[in-house]
């Protein structure tokens, strides 16, 4: 049995590209709408392992509200990223247009981590 998360966002094509950039992921399956403008379903993998699925949100939340109030309803944890450089790269990509809740710092359980609500409203905790 395997398990990974799926996010529903507006601008799903752009979001998938950001995830690929931030985490070194690749699109392994994709199903677009008839107009070829959004993902009905898209699966991403990192090093051959399923990482995340995404689809276009039919009823998106108000991202400006999420950012203004730093609203965390759920956080996606990406850990064992391998290096501080990998964490810094993901932080740079995800923080563009987003809200940094915790900049890159150390905690007792992680020597290099950060928390960001990125521009599509999803909260990410990234860690070495």
Please annotate each region the language model reported:
Residues 1-10, 17-117, 126-128:
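Vicinal oxygen chelate
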Residues 120:
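Active-site His/Glu-centered metal-binding helix of metallohydrolases
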């Amino acid at each position: 049995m395997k398990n990974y998360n799926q996010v529903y966002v507006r601008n799903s094509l752009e979001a998938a590209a950001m995830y690929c950039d931030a985490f070194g992921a690749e699109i392994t399956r994709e199903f677009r709408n008839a107009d070829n403008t959004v993902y009905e379903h898209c699966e991403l993998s990192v090093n051959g392992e399923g990482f995340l699925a995404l689809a276009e949100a039919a009823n998106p939340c108000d991202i400006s509200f999420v950012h203004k109030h730093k609203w965390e309803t759920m956080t996606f944890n990406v850990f064992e990223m391998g290096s501080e450089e990998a964490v810094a790269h993901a932080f740079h990509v995800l923080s563009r247009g987003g809200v940094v809740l915790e900049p890159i710092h150390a905690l007792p359980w992680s020597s290099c981590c950060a928390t960001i609500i990125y521009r599509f409203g999803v909260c990410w905790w990234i860690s070495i």
